[in-house]
Structures are given as structure tokens and as C-alpha cells.
Design a protein with these regions (language model features):
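Bacterial N-terminal signal peptides
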Residues: 6-17
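Boundary at the C-terminal end of the N-terminal hydrophobic targeting segment
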Residues: 19-23
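Extracellular ligand-binding/catalytic regions of CAZymes and related secreted enzymes
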Residues: 25-29, 56, 79, 211, ...
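A glycine-rich, often tryptophan-bearing local segment used as a flexible ligand/cofactor-contacting loop or short
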Residues: 34, 94-185
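Active-site rim elements
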Residues: 37-40, 118, 164, 172-174, ...
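Catalytic beta-strand/loop cores that center a nucleophilic Ser/Cys/Thr
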Residues: 55, 61, 153-237, 301
Length: 306
């Protein structure tokens, strides 16, 4: 009788542990996506595309936090950052109010995850801590007073303190992305070079460039310009991705490379680790691949049991 009770007890403990492990594996990353007031981009389409990319992975649940339209009262924008594991910024408008700025700074410093997409490096140049959080930015009056240009040359960072404005882009085009920190969790196992579909490539960014690690660059206008990087701010992890232009259509976001690095960057920013497999459809140096439905095809993860 005692042996039988012991076996039952062991079985119950095993079932409980297995259920707990399963629950941990299924934990969804609560994500707030901030957007609005960007007259140069179809931010609504970009938000919907990224929401699909994130939620189709099964790892994220995305809520939108939109600011008022241009001319509206920015004081009505009062997001509760601390309810979320991750904040994705897809924003290009007015500087947030001081209480919101302070709450955001605390959220990040306390360990919150942040992902900054494309033109979100442009606004709020007058907010010192935002510049620290994003590492470097473009336009919006930025120049040598805000910090140096940063680019990659001969395996090293180059800090260029020469005077000049921040920010430039030419016509949209395909480009080859080169990884500069291949052992970082976001890039671990991915091809070191891959072709990205047509996009608007930002160059000549400048800023405080503190606590930054360049992840990837592209060769533009005679030098290797950073396109992806991370920043540490207090206990917080920030992933900045300059890819993802959305004019009338989010076609750049259909690129498999964009989607995979976005997913991996979001997971890393939220948790400090990346658990995702390297997909079979990831692009190579000479060939881009697309996921037009903003989700992985069935064959992309052959090791995963469906």
C-alpha cells in the first residue's frame, strides 16, 4: 500500500513539473507597440505587419498604443509601460510629456526591453535620455553637439567627431547585410552576409553612442554604416533596427531577413536570450527570400515538431 501511494505521489509530482515546464515554454511576451504622428511613413501598415510577424510566431501578444494625430494634445498619451515585457517603438512625432518620459526611462533602467524600428531614431532629439537609449539618431536638428558619427572600418569602430548634420538616405534599393557580432544571441547561427529586399537605408547617424554594440552594417556611400545595434541602459536591453521602411506598402518587411532578425531582436530585448531556430528559408548573400504573409512557411523550421 505504501509503495502504491509513493508511486502515485511521484506521478503527481512529475505531472505537476511537466505542466509547469509546459506553461513556462508557452509564456507569451507581452508587447506594447507605440506609433503615430509620422508623416513620412505609412505607420499604420507597418504596425499591422509587425503585429502579424510577432503574433504569428506564437511568442508575442501585441497591444497598440497610438499617440494623438498631429496637432492633438500629446498630454493625452499616457501608456503604462510597466505592464509589458517589451516596448516596440515605431514612432515619428512630438516629444512625449515629462511624466511619460520619466516613466519610460525608469522602465528601461529597471530592465524593460525596447526595440526601435527605422524612423523611430528621428524624433525627440530634445530628449537627452532617449538619445542615450537609442545610441544615435538622425535629422530633427541633430549635429556635432549630439555626438560623433559611428561606422565600421577594418574590423573596428570609427568615431567621427567632424561637424555636420545627422541623417541621410538615398533611393530605396536592395542591399547586403554584413554581421559584425556573429556570436551575439540575435545573430547566432545566421549566415554572416545576406541580401535584404528593397528598403530605405539610413546613414550618417550620430549621437552619444555609449554602451553600444554594432550587430550589422551595410556598405553605403563609401563606408560600412551600422544598421542594427544594441544598447545597454541601466538593466535594460535595447535593439535598434534601421530596416523596415513603409511608404505606401510594408514591402521591406516581407523580407525573411527582416522578419527573423526582428523576432530574435524582440525576444532578446525582452528576455536576454534567443531560443529560436535558424530557419531554412533565411536569405543568403546573393539571394533574398520573402515571407509575404508575414509568417514562417511550414518548411522553415524542419526540427520543430508540428
Amino acid at each position: 500500500m505504501k509503495t502504491r501511494l509513493t508511486l502515485i505521489l511521484v506521478l503527481l509530482i512529475y505531472i505537476g513539473a511537466a505542466s509547469h515546464t509546459h506553461a513556462q515554454q508557452k509564456k507569451v511576451i507581452k508587447t506594447m507597440m507605440i506609433a503615430g504622428q509620422d508623416g513620412s511613413h505609412y505607420w499604420q501598415g507597418a504596425c499591422e505587419a509587425m503585429k502579424q510577424i510577432l503574433e504569428n510566431s506564437g511568442m508575442f501578444k501585441v497591444d497598440f498604443a497610438f499617440t494623438p494625430d498631429f496637432g492633438g494634445d500629446i498630454a493625452t498619451f499616457k501608456p503604462d509601460f510597466h505592464q509589458y515585457d517589451l516596448i516596440v517603438i515605431n514612432y515619428g512625432g512630438a516629444t512625449w510629456t515629462e511624466p511619460v518620459r520619466k516613466n519610460f526611462e525608469k522602465y528601461v533602467a529597471d530592465g524593460g526591453g525596447v526595440v526601435v524600428i527605422h524612423s523611430s531614431v528621428v524624433p525627440m532629439a530634445d530628449w537627452k535620455e532617449y538619445n542615450e537609449i537609442i545610441g544615435m539618431g538622425a535629422w530633427d536638428g541633430r549635429n556635432e553637439k549630439d555626438g560623433p558619427y559611428l561606422y565600421w572600418k577594418d574590423g573596428q569602430y570609427v568615431y567621427d567627431y567632424s561637424p555636420g548634420y545627422a541623417g541621410y538616405h538615398g533611393l530605396q534599393h536592395e542591399t547586403v547585410i554584413e554581421h559584425r557580432a556573429p556570436h551575439h544571441p540575435i545573430l547566432q547561427g545566421l549566415p554572416p552576409q545576406w541580401k535584404h529586399f528593397k528598403d530605405e537605408i539610413y546613414t550618417r547617424l550620430r549621437g552619444p553612442v555609449r554602451n553600444m554594440e554594432i550587430l550589422a552594417t551595410a556598405y553605403e556611400r563609401g563606408r560600412h554604416e551600422p544598421l542594427m545595434w544594441t544598447v545597454s541602459y541601466g538593466k535594460g536591453r535595447i535593439f535598434v533596427d534601421l530596416l523596415g521602411h513603409c511608404g505606401n506598402d510594408p514591402y521591406s518587411m516581407r523580407c525573411t531577413g527582416f522578419q527573423v532578425t526582428l523576432l530574435r531582436g524582440c525576444e532578446w530585448a525582452a528576455t536576454g536570450a534567443v531560443t529560436q531556430e535558424v530557419p531554412a528559408d533565411f536569405p543568403l548573400k546573393d539571394t533574398y527570400t520573402l515571407r509575404p504573409e508575414f509568417k514562417a512557411p511550414f518548411h522553415a523550421y524542419p526540427k520543430t515538431k508540428h
